[in-house]
């Protein structure tokens, strides 16, 4: 057995290793795509209200202050679990009423506290935002973000 690696052997190791890791990369990419499409996000529950709520979320730049699944600014509370924190999983109408009241009461005017601006959303827009937050709360995020307090 040769004590040195020949050019042919080195080339074979390079091509074999490259092919192996390329196959691993393709496999992991396909698995991630499959997981996202079939498990993580349930497209069957997407409604027009959810889509309009997402549009309201983006139009008003909510992510500039809030986080959603850990993404966004950390100025205001995490909102991916606000629907559950407000009891929407047990009593959706009370959670909707709470969201309507919260949005109508902003800014709260409490001195020294961070203030959420008044966006003057219509009742339909608040309902659509509630649909979006309800949909987000049902995404399977593998317990991310770790801070559930909001």
Residue ranges and their predicted role:
Residues 54-60:
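Local sequence-structure signature of Cys/Sec-based thiol-disulfide redox active-site neighborhoods
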Residues 18, 53-54:
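Short N-terminal secondary-structure initiator segments
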Residues 48, 55, 69, 73, ...:
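Extracytoplasmic electron-transfer domains, predominantly the class I c-type cytochrome c fold
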Residues 1-48, 102, 132-150:
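Post-cleavage N-terminal segment of exported redox proteins
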Residues 62-65:
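Short cysteine clusters
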């Amino acid at each position: 057995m040769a004590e040195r690696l020949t050019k042919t052997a080195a080339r074979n190791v390079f091509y074999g290793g490259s092919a192996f890791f390329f196959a691993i990369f393709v496999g992991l990419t396909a698995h991630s795509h499959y997981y996202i499409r079939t498990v993580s996000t349930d497209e069957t529950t997407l409604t027009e209200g959810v889509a309009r709520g997402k549009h309201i979320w983006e139009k008003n730049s909510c992510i500039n202050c809030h986080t959603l699944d850990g993404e966004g600014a950390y100025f205001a509370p995490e909102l991916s679990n606000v629907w559950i924190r407000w009891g929407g999983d047990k009593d959706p109408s009370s959670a909707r009423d709470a969201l309507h009241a919260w949005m109508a009461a902003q800014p709260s005017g409490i001195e020294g506290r961070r203030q959420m601006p008044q966006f003057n959303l219509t009742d339909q827009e608040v309902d659509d935002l509630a649909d979006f937050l309800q949909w987000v709360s049902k995404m399977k995020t593998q317990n991310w973000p770790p801070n559930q307090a909001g």
